[in-house]
């Protein structure tokens, strides 16, 4: 990824990172809209959520949202050298596989991430910014896939 794309990612993330829980909730609400079959994968203390709203308001799930936003923050921070996160991201891949997430669902997560960024940034979410984020997300998923494949 070239320096201009890295800067677009950093600039846009500054706006998002001011309210990570709020924007992360938008991401997951969109994810559940697009792929409702993911909802049953989120259980805390053997509690099954009856609706996306029920899930999105639970303290345990809000903690999950915070963690996801921290992973995105780490990717942004290390955008010039994502290889420094390879092992960590492969481990996340293994964890997601272990709880029953299908690898194909990460495409929907990517769509949800772009949706959240567009809602947060409005007109500042340009085609160039979208392309930069798509490239970053693709690299993150590629690293996570190594955990899926057991490499």
UniProtKB/Swiss-Prot annotation:
Heme b binds at residues 64, 96. Its main location: cytoplasm. The keyword Manganese does not apply. Its EC number is 1.7.-.-. Keywords: Cytoplasm, Disulfide bond, Heme, Iron, Metal-binding, Mitochondrion, Oxidoreductase. Phosphorylated during hypoxia by ERK1/ERK2. Phosphorylation regulates the heme pocket hexacoordination preventing the association of His-64 with the heme metal center. Thereby, promotes the access of dioxygen and nitrite to the heme and stimulates the nitrite reductase activity. Phosphorylation during hypoxia is stabilized by 14-3-3 proteins. Belongs to the globin family. This is Neuroglobin. It comes from Oryctolagus cuniculus. The gene is NGB.
């Amino acid at each position: 990824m070239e320096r201009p794309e890295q800067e677009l990612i950093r600039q846009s993330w500054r706006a998002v990172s001011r309210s990570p829980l709020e924007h992360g909730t938008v991401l997951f609400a969109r994810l559940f809209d697009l792929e409702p079959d993911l909802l049953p994968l989120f259980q805390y203390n053997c509690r099954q959520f009856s609706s996306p709203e029920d899930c999105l308001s639970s303290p345990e799930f809000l903690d999950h949202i915070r963690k996801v936003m921290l992973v995105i923050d780490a990717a942004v921070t290390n955008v010039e050298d994502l290889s420094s996160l390879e092992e960590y991201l492969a481990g996340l891949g293994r964890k997601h596989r272990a709880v029953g997430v299908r690898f194909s669902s990460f495409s929907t997560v990517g769509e949800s991430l772009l949706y959240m960024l567009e809602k947060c940034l409005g007109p500042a979410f340009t085609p160039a910014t979208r392309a930069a984020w798509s490239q970053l997300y693709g690299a993150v998923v590629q690293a996570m896939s190594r955990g899926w494949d057991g490499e």
